[in-house]
């Protein structure tokens, strides 16, 4: 850490260290570092996607939803961002939102079978929930 409280190295270094922390199953630490990187490089889709994944893996579903939503606002045809938003919304109990974005991801990429599988799971949960 520097005297100003920022991590040592460049934003590129922070990004790669964040990915390493994710791979080592330290999502909270990864999210903290990647949030710094995203602040420094707000236009980087790679950093934002990694941040969203870290937030999701850390169980910070509302934050992950916000990050995936930012990705979608920059590229509405990003199937992975729709998938990520759908998964995060599902974990947050937002089943209608989850179904909407999982359906979009599955329609964009019918060849990615886990998109359709996640959509079926959310639809089954919605059917079991009378509210």
What are these regions (language model features)?
Residues 1-13, 129-130:
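TPR-adjacent "capping" and linker segments in tetratricopeptide-repeat scaffold/adaptor proteins
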Residues 5-6, 39, 73, 107:
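Structural signature of alpha-solenoid helical repeat scaffolds
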Residues 2, 24-36, 58-70, 92-104, ...:
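Structural signature of tandem alpha-helical TPR/SEL1-like repeats
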Residues 67-91:
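Mid-chain, well-packed structural core segment of small domains
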């Amino acid at each position: 850490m520097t005297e100003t409280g920022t991590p040592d190295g460049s934003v590129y270094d922070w990004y790669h260290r964040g990915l390493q922390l994710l791979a080592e199953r330290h999502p909270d630490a990864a999210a903290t570092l990647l949030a710094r990187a995203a602040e420094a490089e707000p236009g980087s889709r790679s950093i934002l996607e990694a941040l969203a994944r870290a937030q999701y893996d850390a169980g910070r579903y509302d934050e992950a939803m916000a990050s995936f939503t930012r990705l979608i606002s920059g590229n509405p045809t990003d199937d992975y961002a729709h998938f990520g938003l759908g998964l995060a919304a599902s974990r947050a109990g937002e089943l209608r939102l989850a179904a909407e974005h999982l359906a979009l991801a599955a329609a964009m990429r019918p060849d990615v079978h886990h998109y359709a599988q996640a959509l079926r799971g959310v639809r089954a949960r919605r059917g079991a929930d009378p509210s």
